[in-house]
Structure formats: structure tokens, C-alpha cells
């Protein structure tokens, strides 16, 4: 098991377009901003990112966008505890893990 870096992990907000869609270009810019400011890692999918209001597809794409943008320069953490059944929860864990995040927070 690989350990994630110790340090500062801000909880990331989710920027939206005027149409109420996730603004993935802004997500990439925000990720770069956190890295430029010296953060050790980013908590990408969390309560601050309004994860409870995002679909599974949006949560997965958000985690993937941050992970791809960070490209190993910082650790990326995601959370996933929005599912209502155990099978849905397992699916969420698998899909977010497949994005390459460095750590996953699961609240049961």
C-alpha cells in the first residue's frame, strides 16, 4: 500500500456554469491554483464540492478531472457515500477508484 503525502488538503468547491452544469475547465484551473499555492493534496469530491447534489457520473468525472489535472503532482482524495444501497455504494467505490485517486473516504 502506498501512503499519501502528509500536509495541507483543502476541500475543493465545485464551480458551475451559468446553466448549472459543472464547469470542468474551471475545475482544471482551480486544481492548478491549489497546486501553485503549495497544497500537498486536494480533497476533490467531498461535502464542500456539493457531492450529495451530484450524480454518480458527475462525481466520477469530477474526481477524474482533478486526478488527470494533478497528474501526480499532488495527492487527490475523493469521498463517496451518497449511495442508498450496499451494491450502489460498491459501484461508486469501484468507479471513483478507477479514476486513479490516491485515497478514498467512505463514511458508513
Language-model features and meaning:
Residues 2-10, 14-108:
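Active-site beta->alpha loop and helix N-cap motifs at the rims of alpha/beta catalytic domains
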